[in-house]
Amino acid sequence: MIFIVVKFTIRPDKADEWPSLVDEFTQATRGEEGNIFFEWSRSVDTPNQFVLVEAFADSAAGGVHVSSDHFKNFIAWVPGVIVTKPEIINVEVPGDGWGQMAELTPASAS
């Protein structure tokens, strides 16, 4: 599995719009055959920073993704709304998706 984490720092005036700005790209990517997950989170410390956590089945699926029209479109417009070059971690890891955290179990409801 190809596991990728990308930090985007968005112009403060565009931060609240970010989820709607990336929605079409997000939905298209989630629809790709080799996509395992594609999830956005907003930083609780830096309100104009968003973190994308994504995974693809293998490097071939990742290649299909970066060759897609929706990826190319995203790359074309994003420079207008970011304030720093995105930071990325891109690694190949064993597995095919999320696992359960062994150290935690929800408390039973009383």
Q: What residue ranges belong to the model's regions?
A:
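An amphipathic, aromatic/His-enriched active-site/gating alpha helix that lines ligand/cofactor pockets
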Residues: 24-37, 55-90
